[in-house]
């Protein structure tokens, strides 16, 4: 199966997706936040909050997995992006954001997850420019799919139409 057939871009509420796993853009102390994190926690229920409180910490670029609890998704993979600063910090930050995607996909492979959805990690409160973050996300995901023996499908779940269209264009370019 070609790579493009294993990718999709949707404009949707990630908490409504009935797939194997969704990815959460968490903070390093795994404390309740707003945006995607707040929506996921609200829908998953108190059990998710309790589990993340016990876990206590996740470093930037790392990822951890929990059950989805009351979500339609079986699992939630939590990852922490760096806060965008740009300038001389940009290369290191880009590598860390790429690790968010790579480590989430690694956990997905290790847990036999075949369908996974990513939000636009880092583009909310962490202020990543959406075009920069999308390119990093897309390139990291495509690279992983090319190397992995696991035949998974990745959904880029976007809040805004413009973001969905950006991912759709990148998918079309891979399709040729």
Residue ranges with predicted function:
Residues 84-176:
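Phosphate/ribose-phosphate-bearing ligand recognition and processing surfaces
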Residues 1-111:
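Glycine-/small-residue-enriched capping loops at alpha/beta junctions
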